[in-house]
Amino acid sequence: MLANYHRLKSGVIKQTEVIPFEYNKKYIQDTYDTYGDGRIQMAWLRIGHILGNIGGFDTLLDVGYGNGDFLKAAVKVAQCYGYEINGYEIPEGCTFADDWQEQDVDVMTFFDVLEHIPDLTFMRHLRAKYVVISVPDCLYHSDQWFENWKHRKPNEHIWHFNEDSLTRFMEENGYICMELNNVEDCIRIHHEKNILTGIFKKLTI
């Protein structure tokens, strides 16, 4: 294991010492606003994937909604809430949720978000019936692979998951895995598995 990283019992890899990272509008513009048509395709892919796995739902909360592309699509099928720290206004028809950790919703989504949050202990207290997550898929072939991996971004990406560790992490927090795949790779094309997407159901609600 590389210096300043350690592996948890679940198999999740965590950066040990972290320098706070600033997330603002420029970060979103540089990271996501350059995707062009892929932004809209991704939003509808995500909606379709959720509907295909859990069926219809009434309420959805998107944590870290970025530039709002996903919520602009989701609001067409459900009552939507969102939370973001970067300064982007929430899309029309959606409600900003300052108290997002206390929200009772059918679906809570974390697209490209979980790996950035320094403290994930809040996960065990979520009240959503379903949680949907997309994170970089950390295959960890070797220390050298991990050192050169494009998604190893110290201080920005703090947590690293693969299929097994994400499943165990969510089980520890009261959710069972319904579906786990690399569906977003049809848009985020890469030479190997790139983005891991999981849909999880709360054991008790």
Description of each model-found segment:
Residues 132-134, 178-181:
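Conserved active-site loop/cleft motifs that coordinate metal ions or position small ligands
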Residues 174:
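Short glycine-rich hinge loops at helix-strand junctions in the catalytic core
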Residues 116-117, 140:
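Short glycine-rich, flexible loops that bind phosphorylated cofactors or substrates
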Residues 1-107, 111, 120-126, 144-149, ...:
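Conserved N-terminal segment of class I S-adenosyl-L-methionine
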Residues 111-114, 134:
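Residues lining the SAM
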Residues 116, 157-160:
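Histidine-centered active-site/metal-ligand motif
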Residues 128-140:
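Conserved beta-strand signature within the Rossmann-like core of class I S-adenosyl-L-methionine
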